[in-house]
A protein has these predicted regions:
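Acidic, histidine-bearing metal-coordination/catalytic regions of metal-dependent phosphoesterases
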Residues: 1-29, 49, 246-258
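Extended active-site neighborhood of metal-dependent phosphoesterases/phosphodiesterases
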Residues: 1-14, 69-166, 198-204, 220-246
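Active-site neighborhood of phospho(di)ester-bond hydrolases with catalytic His/Asp-centered motifs
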Residues: 28-32, 54-60, 87-95, 177-181, ...
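Solvent-exposed loop/turn segments at secondary-structure junctions
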Residues: 33-36, 61-64, 95-99, 134-137, ...
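Conserved, compact domain cores that house catalytic/ligand-binding motifs in diverse enzymes
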Residues: 23-101
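Soluble non-cytosolic domains of exported or imported proteins
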Residues: 34-38, 66, 148-155, 193
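A general structural motif
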Residues: 24, 52, 86, 172-175, ...
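Active-site-proximal segments of metal-dependent phosphoesterases and phosphodiesterases across multiple
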Residues: 144-146, 150, 168-210
Length: 258
């Protein structure tokens, strides 16, 4: 005798690994959610994530990281419900993710091959640099309690960046895209100045096609000029960026709640 009942079932999750060749690539960028998971869900409800190679979380998804439960509540649970079961996440740390008693554990949830928060990755023949901004204030600021050393950290990252852009993988890429949470737009805060002084001379000589940033909570576009030799797109905290790269064309669409 066979006994059966209605049981839960669904198709297995599927995902695509990044292609080894090809110049076409499509992705979505979110940043500065600051724990507003409901807002992120509403913002993304019209996106067909299955059409994109990955979702870039470009910093400040949380205000600070105090425990695992908060990390999931802030954005991970919503990301899984929206797309992350089948569409890969690339995570780029912002200045707020350096804060909180659980901040050192962030890498456990978004590991990289390099073991660092910054990395170089490749989708087809397109190279992506994910650069870690560190904190935006001086290491001596009272809120860090003498525990921060981001100036030394950025200097170490700078030496890695110098090697990364000199690599054959990067030099032979069909396009070169940079993600950096704090934009290199001439801001007066210590972190922005330090990033600009260290990274900009290297990036200006690296053939960068475009940089994507956040941090300011408002949209901005900075065309290439004599100081920054590549365009910079700054996404706000109430919008997402859709980027479609095809051959020698980069098409960007910014969609916001308001």
């Amino acid at each position: 005798r066979t006994v059966a009942s209605n049981v839960y079932k669904r198709a297995p999750f599927r995902f695509r690994t990044f292609p080894a060749t090809g110049t076409d690539c499509s992705f979505v960028i979110l940043n500065d959610i600051h724990g507003r998971a409901d807002d992120m869900t509403e913002l993304c409800r019209e996106i067909n994530f299955g059409k994109h190679d990955f979702v870039m979380l470009n910093g400040d998804m949380s205000n600070s990281i105090e425990n695992e439960e908060q990390l999931f509540r802030d954005f991970i649970d919503a990301s899984v419900n929206l797309y992350a079961s089948e569409t890969p996440i690339l995570y780029n740390r912002g200045n707020h993710e350096t804060r909180g008693v659980f901040a050192d554990r962030l890498h456990d949830y978004f590991p990289t091959r390099s073991g660092r928060h910054y990395q170089l990755c490749k989708v087809g023949s397109v190279c992506f640099l994910l650069l870690d901004c560190g904190e935006d204030k001086p290491d001596t600021d009272i809120e860090y309690g003498g525990l921060a050393d981001y100036d030394a950290y950025r200097r170490e990252e700078c030496e890695w960046l110098r090697r990364a852009v000199a690599s054959e993988t990067f030099r032979n890429a069909s396009a070169r895209v940079v993600f950096l949470h704090i934009p290199l737009d001439g801001g007066t805060w210590h972190g922005s100045n330090h990033l600009r002084n260290l990274f900009l001379p290297i990036l200006n000589e690296a053939g960068i096609n475009i940089m994507f940033s956040g941090h300011t909570h408002r949209y901005g576009f900075h065309p290439a000029n004599d100081e920054v030799r590549f365009p910079v797109v700054v996404n706000g905290n109430q919008s997402y960026i859709r980027c479609d790269m095809t051959g020698d064309r980069i098409a960007i669409r910014i969609v916001g709640l308001r």
